[in-house]
Amino acid sequence: MKRITVLLVAAIAAIAVVAATQAGAASSGTAGLTNPKHFFWGAGQAPASDPTTSLQNDLIYHGGSGGPGAIGVQTKPAVYLVYWGTEWAQGFTTADSDGKLYSSKTLQNYVNSFVGNVGGSPYAGIQTQYCNGVLPGSTSCVGGTGFVTNPKRQLKGVWTDPTPVPSDIVALGLAENLVDDPIAMEAQRASGHFGYDPNATYVIITPPTEIATGQPVYCGYHTQTTSIDGLGNPFRLEYAFIPWQNTNWPGLGQGCGFHNVNAKSNSFGNGVFDSWSIVIGHEYAEAVTDPDNFVSFQDGWNDDQTSENGDKCAWINTQNIALGGHQFAVQPLWSNEAFDATGNGCVVSR
């Protein structure tokens, strides 16, 4: 998610104040630091495209040295899904554009199936060209070590946390500039629930609200909280926030991918839930290849405009891919290898 420092309107300015001290990890209770968010902007809100020369378009490795505990890339990616809120525990329905109702269980099955089958796929294989063992400024991993791998079954756990989502998220969508960031704190609770994994992304998903969190400014983000464990060792907790995607105001759903690929919905959720696989796929890919962000320094793979592998292909040629016997809407991901060979860096397989 490209970090935006030049803000578009005053409302976005309130959301973009992102460095804050907060409560620490659930395992230790010590203080932590929430680092700047990498936002995925809705269609039509993305920054201008990058220049077209090869050097300026390739992702560049930034050294993996962004503070204590930095890893550069996730070499063995893992994902934990957290459905946070009483609504998920109780169940609810959401309406498609034609009024047809879909259950929250159907949505959860769609998301779980996507994340549960992306590991080992050609789509996730795009990331295996990147590593953490090359010099800063490198645009390839020739001679590198610490490559991103593509294991199957990257979904390591699913948790429905029935505790209520705080009202400052539900009503305002400004949690990310509060002293005690509730999203980061929920990620820390998830780490306590599942166990800590430096190669994992903890994905926090909130239920529908009258005013969707953070929307219509952005569709999601990934970031990390830097904390201290019980032995005094610094560690990074990588997490992504996926607010409710299907709220229909003002044009929100289409802005984040509602029916972006599939005009008609089916019983599995294609169409009505297109946005969920597009946005989660975007955040997952960026968290794997550019996980560190210590005090605004992105030390993984991003280009000279700080755009990551998802940003560079956002809303370009979105399409279905087959995973686990189902179709899922996704955006392409950036491939240095493909760009250098063909001039087209936005691909859906490797």
Regions found by a protein language model. Name each.
Residues A19-A25:
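Sec/Tat signal peptide C-region and signal peptidase I cleavage site
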Residues T75-Y80, Y123, D197-Y202, F235-E238, ...:
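Loop/turn elements at helix/coil->beta-strand transitions in domains of secreted/extracellular proteins
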